[in-house]
Each structure stands twice: as structure tokens, then as C-alpha cells.
Regions:
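Sec-dependent bacterial lipoprotein signal peptides
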Residues: 1-20
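Bacterial Sec-dependent N-terminal signal peptides
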Residues: 19-47, 265
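Beta-strand-rich domain onsets/edges
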Residues: 23-31, 158-168
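Short structural boundary motif marking the start of a folded domain
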Residues: 29-36, 67-69, 110, 168-170
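Short amphipathic, basic-aromatic surface patches that mediate peripheral association
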Residues: 35-62, 174-178
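Beta-strand elements of well-folded, non-transmembrane domains
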Residues: 41, 75, 165, 176-178, ...
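Tryptophan-paired
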Residues: 60-125, 181-267
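Extracellular beta-sheet/turn segments enriched in Thr/Pro/Gly and aliphatic residues
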Residues: 134-166, 175, 255-272
Length: 272
């Protein structure tokens, strides 16, 4: 009798086990990791106090603030690169840019680094974790960056990061009624700004920047130069020459050197 009961129980359990196995086999794969990239610094912090710089709308397409992107995803524990893009142009009118990563990426913890605004990878280090802000002593480009640690598992597969500007902008306005005859340009030598920034927003190194601007007669004279931050308050020296383009090495007017402070995502304005 006991043997008969055991046999009946076994027969009753078998279909249940088979049915449970079928349900398990039909579970869909977990969705791939998706990154949503937004822009935090859509305007300079003090843009409303500077007439020479126009405020951008807060609801423009992503590409109106940051035209290009490059990203690298690393395993948090090993540092190995899991996925990396080249520099690509941002297209479309989305305000937040979705990036679908490879479905082959396993669950885990990762570090995502995103750079924006560059035309190529020349200024970015080989490991993608730092950037030369003023390559070859030039002003370089208006670069954005974000970096974040990401948990990817069955419950966390959609993550948003925000791009922040790495540099500030120097604006020089000509307020004199008339400049000496023949002046149609300016040459700036800026001494004492940071040279590099890494993915932790740590600035290092020191460099000088040279910038030349030319203008047409009767043109409203405003020059704008994108610069990395100063090492300290009033720690950057500006030497300015007003020149004629035909002989830029012989300045026609040289104001007194001034100390300035450049800050990330801020406008510094001088008037002559």
C-alpha cells in the first residue's frame, strides 16, 4: 500500500516539475544597459550678467550644447575596457541622448567616462581618462565631461549622466571711441592656466595659451577665448597686444598686463 501511494505521488509531481521548467525556459533575457546622457551646463553660470554672451534656451536639442561625444565603459574592478566609441556627431533633436550598449555586457559594476565637444581624439589620453585642455598652447575646444559608477543588474539597467563644461571663457570688449589707425586684430598671451583635466574633474599641470583674433573695419570688436581654469585667484596673467594683421610681431598698442581669474563654466569679461 505504501509503495502504491509513493508511486501515485511521483506521478502527480512529475507534470508539475515539467510545467515549472517550461516557464523558466521562456523567461526573456534581461534588457541591455542603456545610458541616457543629458547636459547640465547649458549656459555659463553668470551668463545673465554678461551682455556680450547670449543665453541659450533650456530646451534645445542636445547637439546645440554638445555637438560630439566619445565614451568609454570600464569594469570597476579590473579597469578593463568593456565598450568604447570613437568620436561621433550627435544628430537628431532629442534633449537627452540615449545610448544602447552591447547586450553582451554582463551584469556588474562599471565606470562610464564621457567627453563631449571635441572634433577628434587628439587631445584625449590613450586610456580615455584625461584630456589636454590647451593642446599646443592653443585655446582648444569647449569640452564637456561626465564620469559615473554604474550598477547593472536585473533591476538596474537604465542610467542617466549629465555633462558638465570643463572650461571658462574670456571675453574682451573694445570700448574706446577710436583705436590707433591700422589696428585690425589682437594677440593674447595668457600665462598660468591648468593644462589637463581627468575624469574625476581634477585639474593638473600649468600652461600658457596664445590666441589671435582679427576683425573687419567698423566691426563691433568683441573677442572670445575658451580657457581652462586659473590655478588660483588672480593667478593668470593676460598680456594683450593690438596689432595689424600684416605685421603681427610689431604691436601698435599694448595695454598694461592684468591679473585675471578663469573659472570652470564662468565668463570673465574685460573692457578696453
Amino acid at each position: 500500500m505504501k509503495g502504491t501511494i509513493r508511486n501515485i505521488a511521483y506521478i502527480l509531481l512529475l507534470p508539475a516539475m515539467t510545467f515549472t521548467s517550461c516557464i523558466r525556459d521562456e523567461i526573456e533575457d534581461c534588457p541591455p544597459l542603456q545610458i541616457n546622457i543629458a547636459v547640465k551646463d547649458k549656459n555659463y553660470f553668470n551668463v545673465d550678467n554678461v551682455e556680450a554672451e547670449q543665453r541659450k534656451g533650456d530646451n534645445l536639442a542636445f547637439r546645440e550644447y554638445v555637438p560630439t561625444l566619445y565614451y568609454v565603459l570600464r569594469d570597476l574592478n579590473t579597469g578593463d575596457v568593456v565598450e568604447e566609441s570613437g568620436v561621433f556627431e550627435v544628430k537628431g533633436d532629442k534633449q537627452i541622448l540615449p545610448v544602447d550598449l552591447c547586450p553582451c555586457i554582463p551584469h556588474g559594476r562599471y565606470v562610464l567616462t564621457v567627453w563631449g565637444g571635441m572634433s577628434n581624439l587628439d587631445a584625449i589620453s590613450e586610456d580615455g581618462l584625461s584630456l589636454d585642455l590647451n593642446p599646443n598652447s592653443t585655446e582648444g575646444e569647449d569640452i564637456y565631461m561626465t564620469n559615473d559608477t554604474i550598477l547593472y543588474d536585473a533591476w538596474h539597467n537604465n542610467h542617466t549622466v549629465e555633462m558638465e563644461r570643463t572650461k571658462g571663457k574670456l571675453i574682451i570688449e573694445k570700448k574706446w571711441e577710436c583705436l590707433p589707425e591700422g589696428i585690425n586684430g589682437s594677440r593674447k598671451e595668457i600665462n598660468g592656466v591648468y593644462d589637463n583635466v581627468n575624469n574625476a574633474f581634477k585639474y593638473t599641470g600649468i600652461t600658457d595659451v596664445l590666441a589671435t583674433h582679427l576683425w573687419e573695419p567698423e566691426q563691433n570688436i568683441i573677442t572670445k577665448t575658451v580657457l581652462s581654469p586659473s590655478l588660483k585667484e588672480n593667478g593668470t596673467k593676460l598680456h594683450l597686444d593690438f596689432i595689424n594683421a600684416s605685421d603681427p610681431s610689431s604691436p601698435l598698442l599694448t595695454p598694461k598686463d592684468v591679473k585675471i581669474t578663469m573659472k570652470r563654466n564662468e565668463l570673465t569679461v574685460l573692457r578696453y
